[in-house]
Amino acid sequence: MIPTLDAHRAEIVALCRRFHVRRLEVFGSAARGGDFDPARSDIDLLVTYDAEVPRPSLAEHFTLRDLLAALLGRKVDLVIAGAVRNPFVRADIERWKEPLYAA
């Protein structure tokens, strides 16, 4: 996992609580670390929202994405868990994902 994520862990936790996130996991090059290019790579995050509260609107989802991007200083792809249909992509996410937050 890239150091930027650990450096901003407290702020990430605060955003997760604010937006009723149950789990937030990093995957892709930011999880692997070795092939992450600080000049070009984005950060791929898998989000699971709390099922006990109303699901956030798309506007709220994109607000969370934008706040995470501003915090981390780079583009963030915020993928909703369960929305990935391609079995090969799902398998790759499962292989590399690392937890950032769990409620």
Predicted regions: what they are:
Residues 1-25, 31-38, 50-103:
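Catalytic core of pol beta-like nucleotidyltransferases
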